[in-house]
């Protein structure tokens, strides 16, 4: 059996078209959605991510603002800029690209963003509200994964789901969203004993640890849905995920590729969150 491919590029295209329609409707009422992206330093991977985010905004009718600063930028200067953006009515979403230079406290920076403009969903107010099932914003990557389940009609209610990874950005919010959807969720991580015993019993496995081949074919229940959030490089320098795709795709029922799976969805859900922020602001105006 070969798994059905969950195509993140195709689904993203559909969702971005819907976002562009909503953006056009808002713009017609004088509320064009606006996203500000802040990049500090010259991390090459961060530069690529920021470029992709800005392009997605431009391609779909959003106003975008890119603030680029040298790695020597002080924390007070960055906080002052965030304060300005918080008060700017043209900006509905603020995103600070992580990681930040060592002398800047990323936690303090994220907390400085107004919760209603925290389109990454990282602010403590939004992270906490996720526990109650009523966040202003869901973190983009887990939100994108949930849209994949929806589009491919993957049943979540009553399903056994394993999330490998416990980061605040993916692992923990992913587990909460699956729980909210009615799945029975197990979170596994570097200290988990016998990872395979958990994954073999799972209907759904989400791998999000940033480690190659953390999930192999012998660890997967036949017909399971496997979501690969990992971003790594193989020995030839090619992009790969956390899952041994060649092997697991022969066992799983559905699987996401890397690249072309979860990655495009993350930026798409950033657009969706920004649209939602703009719609709220327009309703309150």
Curated annotation (Swiss-Prot):
Q: List UniProt keywords, sorted A-Z.
A: Amino-acid biosynthesis, Histidine biosynthesis, Hydrolase, Methionine biosynthesis, Multifunctional enzyme, NADP, One-carbon metabolism, Oxidoreductase, Purine biosynthesis
Keyword Lipid biosynthesis part of the UniProt annotation: no
Assigned GO CC terms: cytosol
PROSITE patterns in the record, alphabetically? THF_DHG_CYH_1, THF_DHG_CYH_2
| The keyword Metal-binding belongs to this UniProt entry's keyword annotation | no
Show the coiled coil region(s). Answer: none
Give the Enzyme Commission number. 1.5.1.5, 3.5.4.9
Q: Which residues bind NADP(+)?
A: 165-167, 190
Q: A single Gene Ontology molecular function, please? A: methenyltetrahydrofolate cyclohydrolase activity
Please give the biological process terms from Gene Ontology that the record holds.
L-histidine biosynthetic process; methionine biosynthetic process; purine nucleotide biosynthetic process; tetrahydrofolate interconversion
Which InterPro entries does this UniProt record tie to the protein? Aminoacid_DH-like_N_sf, NAD(P)-bd_dom_sf, THF_DH/CycHdrlase, THF_DH/CycHdrlase_cat_dom, THF_DH/CycHdrlase_CS, THF_DH/CycHdrlase_NAD-bd_dom
User: CDD domains recorded for this chain?
Assistant: NAD_bind_m-THF_DH_Cyclohyd
Family note? Belongs to the tetrahydrofolate dehydrogenase/cyclohydrolase family.
Assembly and interaction partners: Homodimer.
Q: What does this protein do?
A: Catalyzes the oxidation of 5,10-methylenetetrahydrofolate to 5,10-methenyltetrahydrofolate and then the hydrolysis of 5,10-methenyltetrahydrofolate to 10-formyltetrahydrofolate.
Q: What is this protein called?
A: Bifunctional protein FolD
Species this protein is from: Burkholderia pseudomallei (strain K96243)
């Amino acid at each position: 059996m070969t798994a059905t491919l969950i195509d993140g590029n195709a689904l993203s295209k559909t969702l971005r078209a819907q976002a562009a329609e909503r953006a056009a409707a808002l713009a017609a009422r004088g509320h064009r959605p606006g996203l500000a992206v802040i990049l500090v330093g010259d991390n090459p991977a961060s530069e690529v991510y920021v470029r992709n985010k800005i392009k997605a905004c431009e391609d779909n009718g959003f106003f975008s603002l890119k603030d680029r600063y040298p790695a020597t930028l002080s924390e007070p200067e960055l906080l002052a800029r965030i304060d300005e953006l918080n008060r700017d009515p043209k900006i509905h979403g603020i995103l600070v690209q992580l990681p930040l230079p060592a002398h800047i406290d990323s936690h303090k920076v994220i907390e400085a963003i107004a919760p209603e403009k925290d389109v990454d969903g990282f602010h403590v107010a939004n992270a906490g509200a996720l526990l109650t099932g009523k966040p202003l914003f869901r973190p983009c990557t887990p939100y994108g994964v949930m849209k994949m389940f929806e589009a491919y009609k993957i049943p979540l209610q009553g399903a056994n789901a394993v999330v490998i990874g416990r980061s605040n950005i993916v692992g923990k919010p992913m587990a909460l969203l699956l729980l909210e959807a009615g799945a029975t969720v197990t979170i596994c991580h570097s200290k988990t004993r016998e990872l395979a015993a958990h994954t073999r019993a799972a209907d759904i496995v989400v791998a999000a640890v940033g480690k190659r081949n953390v999930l192999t074919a012998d660890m997967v229940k036949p017909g399971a849905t496997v979501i690969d959030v990992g971003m790594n490089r193989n020995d030839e320098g090619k992009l790969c995920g956390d899952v041994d795709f060649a092997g697991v795709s022969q066992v799983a029922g559905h699987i996401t590729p890397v690249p072309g799976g979860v990655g495009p969805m993350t930026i798409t859900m950033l657009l969706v969150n920004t649209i939602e922020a703009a719609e709220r602001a327009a309703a309150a105006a």
